[in-house]
């Protein structure tokens, strides 16, 4: 749908491209200790090794799956109804929440009463919000610190292990060479974890202990029961976030829901709705009700819309109402720029690009207009009270992040980081889950300093970075400039990477841009997991490499992050089905394929009863004799 077309709720439908299963993949569920803990994963099937190479079976591998029910052919998807409330029973049985008779937010009530919005409204708005009972704290951190292992924690533990034990067992029982295959395909380089403590197997107790310490969060608002629990922390798989959202210049509710379903199809672990245009409240409701992943927002954006874009007119009362409005819709984490202090603003005067964070610039303007600290800072404990009543996590915003390589690691950025560490202590006093946002634009040699200082000042609270971009010279390719920095800082310990699309600095991303950003950042996150030595991270690489060596082209495509593009590139030059079993590609052709030559050496060794190194030596002798007999000319006329 184009932005100019009218969105009508009754006609809303899911994007068909987002619900089709990926090639040779199917949704499976691993059951936990109770029947309603069913953890989704994607199973990728593989063909057997060709008879000429041993004819051994290649069991399916299992990969992390963020797509919710959208890629499950057995699920009935109707975005007008929203997703099933997966966690509803878990929330209710804890007995510490109550269903409200009406919305608590004044703005929320006014939108609900506006009949002119009926055609836009999500049909399920009869849903009543939920809040903690008086004096109760419903955060996962609070439960963890009381020693409780929640169903969410067990769910996360199963999810992080990615059914690795079942895969290893399937290798061992695959045939006479099973033990050898298991050893070969689970081999992994040790990695360098820079102090992370990653166990061989993730247990529910380990999840609980990490959440209790503040080293990980499970962003699960009690008003977003549709979400599938996931975890963000340096001792877990590196996660990625996708930003979506409309602006005053374009996009519609339909397009933003499509972007969300598209982002999670390709691997977005969380989605941030950064809408600044029309109907922000209604757009967010549609996204949350249809999202199986946590949704984040920057509440100050909507608060600013309520005062017609005049930052100096913002008040604590308007912001508080916005927090409650969004918490009761089900937002799982809020970016709040409470670390932008009055004394830091002059430090940005000599920057090349000043304050580039929208939230940071809004609060800097407010501080200067009132010549005092922002209400985000002075009311921080009041904000904590709201967060723990709904289990909304803090994403403490880096409002003074560098917007250019020139400004990297300056006093303003690092001063704010120290303040974010102090605010983390306050949030933890209230048992509110917290992550810390980071830069930005940073050259490669300064990236590790960012990670080290964050660990020091913020006491290992999860780091969440935008890239960082490692150079400023490539508009249109900033998914690559930032992907370089993302892989690096993910290796050093960043828990979640915020994607950057090719449109960064240039315009609002469309669906294809979202996919490009997601794939780039899934690659960066996976590279970081490999470098850290995360258990099982190399399984997919090993499986794909084996498929490549055995010329199982379809398996190569399907084991990759983007099967569609891999197949498209291959078929540009070799489109026929016969090319899918050929022992070469268009890069080297049939006579110069290094992998085919290696296989020929192995076949020769087996035929002659030789070891591979002996076969190479003997083969060279034979070729030398042929060379001399042919006239010993380096070049021959043909």
From Swiss-Prot:
Cofactor(s) the protein needs: [4Fe-4S] cluster
Organism: Aromatoleum aromaticum (strain DSM 19018 / LMG 30748 / EbN1) (Azoarcus sp. (strain EbN1))
Similarity comment text for this entry: Belongs to the ThiC family.
Organism lineage string: Bacteria, Pseudomonadati, Pseudomonadota, Betaproteobacteria, Rhodocyclales
Cofactor, free-text remark: Binds 1 [4Fe-4S] cluster per subunit. The cluster is coordinated with 3 cysteines and an exchangeable S-adenosyl-L-methionine.
Pathway: Cofactor biosynthesis; thiamine diphosphate biosynthesis
Keyword Isomerase: no
Gene3D superfamilies in the cross-refs: 6.10.250.620, Radical SAM ThiC family, central domain
Stated name of the protein: Phosphomethylpyrimidine synthase
């Amino acid at each position: 749908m184009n932005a100019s077309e009218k969105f009508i709720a009754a006609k809303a439908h899911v994007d068909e491209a987002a619900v089709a299963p990926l090639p040779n993949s199917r949704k499976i569920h691993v059951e936990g200790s109770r029947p309603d803990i069913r953890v989704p994963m994607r199973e990728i099937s593989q063909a057997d090794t060709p008879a000429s190479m041993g004819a051994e079976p290649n069991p399916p591998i299992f990969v992390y799956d963020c797509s919710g029910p959208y890629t499950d052919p057995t699920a009935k998807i109707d975005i007008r109804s929203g997703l099933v409330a997966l966690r509803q029973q878990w929330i209710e049985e804890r007995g510490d929440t109550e269903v409200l008779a009406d919305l608590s937010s004044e703005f929320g009530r006014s939108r609900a009463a506006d009949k002119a919005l009926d055609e836009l409204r999500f049909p399920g708005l009869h849903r009543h919000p939920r809040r903690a009972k008086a004096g109760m704290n419903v955060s996962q951190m609070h439960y963890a610190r009381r020693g409780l292992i929640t169903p969410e924690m067990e769910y996360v533990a199963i999810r992080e292990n990615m059914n690795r034990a079942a895969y290893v067992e399937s290798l061992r029982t695959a045939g006479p060479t099973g033990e050898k295959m298991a050893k070969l395909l689970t081999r992994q380089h040790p990695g360098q974890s820079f102090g992370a403590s990653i166990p061989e197997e993730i247990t529910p107790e380990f999840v609980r202990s990490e959440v209790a310490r503040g080293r990980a969060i499970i962003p699960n608002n009690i008003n977003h029961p549709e979400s599938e629990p996931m975890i963000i922390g340096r001792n877990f798989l590196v996660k990625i976030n996708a930003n979506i959202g409309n602006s005053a210049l374009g996009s519609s509710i339909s397009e933003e829901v499509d972007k969300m379903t598209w982002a999670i199809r390709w691997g977005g672990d969380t989605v941030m709705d950064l809408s600044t245009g029309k109907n922000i409240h209604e757009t967010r409701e549609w996204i949350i009700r249809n999202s199986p992943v946590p949704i984040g927002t920057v509440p100050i954006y909507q608060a600013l819309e309520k005062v017609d874009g005049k930052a100096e007119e913002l008040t604590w009362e308007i912001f508080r109402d916005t927090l409650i409005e969004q918490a009761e819709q089900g937002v799982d984490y809020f970016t709040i720029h409470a670390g932008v202090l009055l004394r830091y603003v002059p430090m940005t005067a000599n920057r090349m690009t000043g304050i580039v964070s929208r939230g940071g610039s809004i609060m800097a303007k407010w501080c200067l207009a009132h010549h005092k600290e922002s209400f985000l800072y002075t009311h921080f404990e009041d904000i904590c009270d709201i967060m723990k009543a709904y289990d909304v996590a803090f994403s403490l915003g880096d409002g003074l992040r560098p917007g250019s390589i020139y400004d990297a690691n300056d006093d303003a950025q690092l001063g704010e980081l120290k303040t974010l560490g102090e605010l983390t202590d306050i949030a933890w006093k209230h048992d509110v889950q917290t992550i810390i946002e980071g830069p930005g634009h940073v050259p490669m040699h300064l990236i590790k300093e960012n990670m080290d200082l964050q660990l020091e000042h913020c006491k290992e609270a999860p780091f969440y970075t935008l890239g960082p971009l490692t150079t400023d010279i490539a508009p249109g390719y900033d998914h690559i400039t930032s992907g370089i920095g993302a892989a690096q800082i993910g290796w050093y310990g960043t828990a979640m990477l915020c994607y950057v699309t090719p449109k960064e600095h240039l315009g609002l991303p469309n669906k294809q841009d979202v996919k490009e950003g997601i794939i780039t950042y899934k690659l960066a996150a996976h590279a970081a997991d490999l470098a850290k030595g995360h258990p099982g991270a190399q399984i997919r690489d090993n499986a794909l490499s084996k498929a490549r060596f055995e010329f199982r082209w379809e398996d190569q495509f399907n084991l990759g992050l983007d099967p569609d593009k891999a197949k498209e590139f291959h078929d540009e030059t070799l489109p026929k089905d016969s090319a899918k079993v050929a022992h070469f590609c268009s890069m080297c052709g049939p006579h110069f394929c290094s992998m085919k030559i290696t296989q020929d050496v192995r076949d020769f060794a087996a035929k002659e009863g030789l070891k591979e190194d002996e076969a190479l030596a003997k083969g060279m002798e034979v070729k030398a004799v042929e060379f001399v007999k042919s006239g010993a000319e380096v070049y021959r006329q043909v």
